Amino acid sequence: MDIVGGQNLRQMWDDLAGVYGDKTALIFESCEGIVRQFSYASLNEEINRTANLFYSLGIRKGDRVALHLDNCPEFIFCWFGLAKIGAIMVPINARLLGEESAWILQNSQVSLLVTSAQFYPMYREIRQDNSTPLNHICLIGEQLPADDGVSHFSQLQARQSATLCYTPVLSTDDTAEILFTSGTTSRPKGVVITHYNLRFAGYYSAWQIALRDDDVYMTVMPAFHIDCQCTAAMPAFSAGSTFVLLEKYSARAFWDQVRKYQATVTECIPMMIRTLMVQPAAPTDRQHHLREVMFYLNLSAQEKDAFTERFGVRLLTSYGMTETIVGIIGDRPGDKRRWPSIGRVGFSYEAEIRDDQNRPLPAGEIGEICIKGIPGKTIFKEYYMQPEATARALEPEGWLHTGDSGYQDEDGYFYFVDRRCNMIKRGGENVSCVELENIISAHPKIQDIVVVGIKDAIRDEAIKAFIVLNEGETLSEAEFFSFCENNMAKFKVPSFMEIRTDLPRNCSGKIIKKNLK
């Protein structure tokens, strides 16, 4: 089923500008509260000027350009400006440091970078090291350093025409983006995303939340992440909705921003839900227009119930990853939700639970979640320059091995158990980290929790819990272990616990377990 119809991203924006014109397309709010707003017509002009900017710097179809930016309108300009001339965006996680960023530049062979003043010192050092092909930096900000190979984005963009000066032939099969995975356990892999992938994501995710042109979709997710791009921005623009992009997440400001922009849809991760719940209760908690909150794993039933009751919202569960582009399993519009199920497989996909010999399993049995899609269309095309990694993850028939454990019930609802690499082997027993984290998170003194496996000479692995307490609370080891013993099987009780002020996280809120031992 082809729902894109050969329409690439250049055509999409030209059509949107013509159809929606002066309707508000994008609202951006900075951490300082400065608001910038663009209609569909004016946003398309900004995108065209940015495309011409890249052309003036020598960028042509197939060239790769890196973006290292926090949320800002310029990210949107660059993303679609590159797509309009057939060039390829390589977004870099804004939290990455020098060595990690240089590795991505080297592996994607990027010569041009767009970044902001706060990240410039790091990239100046990278250029001086001559370890990457990077030879030019386009800088967003008021002050421009007097360095060779540096240009000012705003000044250069303002000089460009709002009409495209370079229009190569584009196909929906062309690569639009190389998005590097978060790499919480190893080096990231470059996920190749096509024009078709992004167009499909817009239609699919709009269907998933029944998005209309009178909706306002607000997100705090980072623009360099698949969630912001393919479950927020693309559906919002594809449906002619208003997309509200906030620079950073603030638990204190979140609900005021929801009300200020009259948001009807937003997306949340567990970290957001937990930090919102520790804010003081207010009479305005349920005074908003939200009809759906897109939710990504993982949350205990107690946390879910407390959040939905306090704020009067529905959580729409969506399961996916960078490689699936969208939430390929999830709740459907109008369906009764079956918590803790992650929902049913969406249109254009198939899903199975398979054993270690790659054989389908019956309902109720735990195995690997496998998804069938069309590479380069409904799932990613490949890992950039990594054919062996692509072959391990993606079968020739289009079956993608997610690396996640789960099961399905007799009615076709799927249930997530854990990342297969997130299982702890303890004395012959497989212990799910997610299961333990959900149990421990119910302790009233605990704000955040993660468990990891550490080497144990006798039992393969021991279990260690890292804990963040609610403000002003104290928790003794005796109290912690007693709680665990009363709420889980003996072999699942952690052997060690450590209290921390925070936990290391990547851009999507996932805890970076390789930094904890």
UniProtKB/Swiss-Prot annotation:
GO BP: carnitine metabolic process; fatty acid metabolic process
Keywords of the record: Ligase
Q: Does the keyword GTP-binding apply?
A: no
Lineage: superkingdom: Bacteria
Which Pfam families does this entry report, sorted A to Z? AMP-binding, AMP-binding_C
Q: What is its EC number?
A: 6.2.1.48
Q: What reaction(s) does this enzyme catalyze?
A: 4-(trimethylamino)butanoate + ATP + CoA = 4-(trimethylamino)butanoyl-CoA + AMP + diphosphate; crotonobetaine + ATP + CoA = crotonobetainyl-CoA + AMP + diphosphate; (R)-carnitine + ATP + CoA = (R)-carnitinyl-CoA + AMP + diphosphate
Q: Is Ligase one of the keywords?
A: yes
Enumerate the InterPro entries for this protein.
AMP-bd_C (IPR025110), AMP-bd_C_sf (IPR045851), AMP-binding_CS (IPR020845), AMP-dep_synth/lig_dom (IPR000873), ANL_N_sf (IPR042099), CaiC (IPR023456)
Molecular function as annotated in GO: carnitine-CoA ligase activity; crotonobetaine-CoA ligase activity; medium-chain fatty acid-CoA ligase activity
Q: What class of enzyme is it?
A: ligase
Name the family the entry cites: Belongs to the ATP-dependent AMP-binding enzyme family.
- Which PANTHER family does this UniProt record tie to the protein? ACYL-COA SYNTHETASE (PTHR43201), MEDIUM-CHAIN ACYL-COA LIGASE ACSF2, MITOCHONDRIAL (PTHR43201:SF5)
Q: What is this protein called?
A: Crotonobetaine/carnitine--CoA ligase
Species whose genome carries this gene? Salmonella dublin (strain CT_02021853)
